[in-house]
């Protein structure tokens, strides 16, 4: 399959890319800083882009079989990348005719010390 991956510079996203390449898939990663993405492979294409700026990756979506999102967020601005970024990815998918989207996250596995205790407890119970 021809895959496009968002969030490839994080731990979860990088593992997604590694496993996809091991399975023989062609993988395109969209990253803000391509020079910081050190993984290399014959079936890997690294493209500069930002999920908050859809024009930077819209063309790259063409011809892909599926999109995978392992987007992570900072605790200072926790929803913008997930909500606006994923909406931008989905819009680019619609325009390119890509019908499969897989979203995964490590959210809930690590809690910042500044998160209120009650919030941490509720999340632990749910997850």
Task: Provide a role label for each language-model segment.
Residues 3-25:
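N-terminal Rossmann NAD(P)H-binding glycine-rich loop of SDR-like oxidoreductase domains
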Residues 108-113:
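Conserved catalytic-site region of short-chain dehydrogenase/reductase
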